[in-house]
Design a protein with these regions (language model features):
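Catalytic core of soluble alpha/beta enzymes
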Residues: 4-137
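Flexible C-terminal active-site loop/helix
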Residues: 135-206
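Gly-rich Lys/Arg/Thr-decorated short loops/hinges at beta-loop-alpha junctions or inter-strand turns
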Residues: 1
């Protein structure tokens, strides 16, 4: 699967998505992420255009704070298109509000924002309770282990910049193999060791 950003220029977005579809072919899932850039009616129109190009995932079509707007998109988006949000959730209460509002087809959570492994697993427990899939946002080395403990985890985001940083700063960062990350259960913690010399290169003394 491939995810691309949309929302900066709504008039150009359908043609950009079409170009991406032509580049990756019909056999690869295509996701789009608007980061809340669209208004409600604009997002609905874009959902129709994107669905015609085989887009299966529409992330933050409107602001993640607009739960009514997200519910509107979830109810009216074309069949087969998931509405996803949650990467800016910081507390279990935020995730619960989204789920109670019926605002998402897939809840996103990011352990670097929502209270670490414990916060992520609380979001996972809420997904269990509401029977909603969970997607991990970025930081694949961290989330690979957590997703193994989350029964409703659908996938995690393999974001190039995060992967590059993880490989630069840690020994033992997991390689992707045929779209999969396989944590080694014999290793403690997250299975990595810091490269302290690399950390020191970016140290700022105050």
């Amino acid at each position: 699967m491939v995810k691309m950003k949309v929302g900066r220029d709504p008039t150009a977005d359908p043609s950009r998505v079409r170009a991406a579809r032509e580049a990756i072919g019909a056999g690869v899932e295509l996701f789009v992420d608007a980061n809340g850039a669209y208004a409600r009616k604009e997002a609905l129109a874009q959902a129709e255009a994107f669905a015609a190009l085989g887009v299966r995932w529409f992330e933050e079509p409107v602001s993640s704070d607009d739960l009514d707007g997200l519910r509107l998109l979830r109810d009216r988006a074309p069949p087969g298109m998931d509405i996803a949000t949650g990467e800016y959730g910081y507390t279990p209460w935020t995730f619960r509000r989204m789920l109670e509002a019926g605002a998402v087809d897939v809840l996103q959570a990011d352990a670097t924002r929502c209270g670490g492994p414990t916060g992520f697993l609380r979001a996972a427990a809420l997904c269990d309770a509401f029977q909603v899939p969970l997607s991990a946002h970025c930081a694949p080395q961290l989330h690979a282990h957590l997703c193994c403990a989350a029964t409703r985890a659908r996938h995690l985001e393999y974001f190039h910049d995060h992967v590059r940083i993880e490989r630069m700063l840690f020994d033992g960062a997991l390689p992707a193999e045929r779209g999969l990350l396989r944590p080694d259960p014999s290793l403690p913690g997250l299975g990595v060791e810091p490269r302290w010399a690399e950390f020191e290169r970016y140290e700022i003394r105050v």
